[in-house]
């Protein structure tokens, strides 16, 4: 989130953060949001550990709509979102994933890239669909996989690119430059 806030504050991204929600009660993102004067709230997702559904999904949609949100950015939100949220914000839910999708969806993708002997890894910003990390791709940034990389060193390099990729994708979206054709997102 910090890279998005920074891009807005520098005038590099014409957007407004209307609400920050976190599914972890003491998540650092809530404190970070408050330091920037952004409305922030914890969203109780119990009893589900990996999904956003039921009353929590209803509450999430209610809060986002009440705040006037038209786009939902999933940054560090490690839950599977369901069709109800996607229908409330059609093709306006974006996620960032630390892999060059469609390779290595799900968790620990940088470790998977090392295990498979990949020569490049990276990050993908994509629209969220009903699958897991399977929506149309907006932006990708690649990093080399070095011979002496560990999961930690590779992940750190990927995170640098994450901080560039999300603001870039949001700039395209805010400027109306994204056109979805099937699985392809054209930027024009």
Regions found by a protein language model. Give the residues of each.
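One-carbon transfer enzymes
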Residues: 1-188
């Amino acid at each position: 989130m910090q890279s998005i806030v920074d891009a807005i504050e520098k005038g590099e991204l014409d957007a407004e953060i209307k609400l920050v929600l976190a599914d972890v009660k003491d998540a650092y993102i809530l404190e970070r949001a408050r330091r920037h004067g952004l409305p922030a709230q914890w969203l109780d997702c119990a009893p589900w550990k990996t999904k956003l559904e039921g009353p929590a999904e209803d509450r999430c949609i209610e809060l986002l709509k009440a705040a006037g949100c038209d786009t939902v950015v999933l940054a560090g939100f490690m839950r599977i979102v369901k069709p109800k949220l996607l229908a409330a914000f059609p093709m306006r839910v974006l996620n960032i994933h630390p892999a060059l999708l469609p390779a290595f969806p799900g968790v620990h993708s940088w470790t998977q890239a090392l295990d498979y002997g990949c020569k490049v890894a990276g990050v993908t910003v994509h629209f969220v669909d009903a699958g897991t990390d399977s929506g149309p791709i907006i932006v990708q940034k690649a990093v080399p996989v070095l011979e002496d990389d560990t999961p930690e060193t590779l992940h750190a390099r990927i995170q640098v690119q994450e901080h560039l990729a999300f603001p870039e994708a949001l700039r395209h979206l805010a400027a109306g430059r994204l056109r979805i054709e099937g699985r392809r997102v054209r930027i024009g």
